[in-house]
A protein has these predicted regions:
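Conserved loop-alpha-helix segment in the C-terminal half of the alpha/beta-hydrolase fold
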Residues: 197-233
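Gly/Ala-rich beta-loop-alpha elbow adjacent to hydrolase catalytic centers
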Residues: 80, 84, 88
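Short beta-to-alpha linker loops that shape the active-site pocket of alpha/beta-hydrolase fold enzymes
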Residues: 40-45, 108, 233-234
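Conserved HGGG/HGGXW glycine-rich cap/lid loop of the alpha/beta-hydrolase fold
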Residues: 2-48
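Catalytic histidine-centered segment of alpha/beta-hydrolase-like enzymes
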Residues: 230-242, 246
Length: 260
């Protein structure tokens, strides 16, 4: 578990790959002004948290509370990234007294269905993992180029992020299992979420992982919810433009109403 910085506590939940290390630029940017508590998902070998396969998706919801308890935090802003958004929203619905704010970054919604390419990957994750990795740079190139237009800075980002990914490899089999766990889970009613909520997405043309319209579905379900587009980003804006992402969250935490 990572506990870094001082100020308003933010619990940052990683996406489907399950590794907090992939989010390090966002962790560092947020920790300049806030206290960031993050972790890898509990079914990762490096995780210090328990995982009972019989509990399936509920493991991750329990993990959020365990992390807060270990950090000595009674209440926090809970932020979920992509698949982590499902975890964050479920925790906010089931433990509303512990959530003072909810942030859903390029988040999956319970109604999400994988597209054809994603379904192929889920059927044979190990066999297709090399193809998935090999085609990742091409899928992300437009987004990274928009976020980091300077060639030198872009090359440095790709090298640094690639190093983080290689050092903290994701398990294709676990990723596929996480999707199945979510699809089988009985989610709490969204009206149980009482915390002010911020939806952060990239631009629709740049997110090739989770369509922006999927994340926006929360706007129809939550009473106190707003949407902000992080310009020149797609699905991974919190790492391509971490300071901008931290700025959006900071203004949300300060209670400033942002334009959707």
């Amino acid at each position: 578990m990572i506990d870094k910085g001082h100020g308003t506590p933010i619990v940052l939940i990683p996406g489907l790959q399950g590794r907090w290390e992939w989010l390090r630029p966002a962790v560092d940017a947020l920790a300049k002004h806030h206290r960031v508590i993050t972790f890898s998902l509990c079914d990762e070998r490096s995780s210090p948290f328990p995982c009972d396969p019989a509990k399936a998706f509920a493991n991750y919801v329990e993990q959020v509370e365990l992390a807060m308890d270990r950090a000595g935090v009674r209440q926090a802003v809970v932020a979920g990234v992509s698949y982590g958004g499902l975890i964050a929203a479920e925790f906010a619905a089931r433990r509303p007294e512990r959530v003072c704010g909810l942030v859903l970054a390029s988040a999956l919604h319970t109604s999400w269905q994988p597209n054809a390419r994603q379904r192929q990957f889920l059927k044979a994750p190990r066999l297709l993992s090399l193809l998935f990795v090999a085609t990742a740079p091409k899928r992300m190139n437009a987004e990274v180029s928009a976020a980091i237009p300077a060639p030198g800075a872009r090359l440095l980002f790709k090298a640094a992020q690639g190093f983080r990914v290689v050092r903290s490899l994701a398990s294709p089999a676990k990723m596929a299992r996480r999707v199945e766990w979510a699809r089988a889970h009985h989610f709490a009613e969204r009206h149980a979420i009482k915390a002010p909520t911020l939806i952060v997405t990239g631009e629709p043309s740049l997110d090739n992982v989770v369509p922006v319209d999927v994340s926006r579905r929360y706007l129809d379900e939550l009473e106190c919810c707003e949407h902000v587009v992080l310009e020149r980003t797609g699905h991974i804006g919190l790492v391509t433009r971490p300071d901008a992402f931290a700025g959006v969250l900071g203004r949300f935490l300060d209670g400033v109403r942002l334009s959707a």
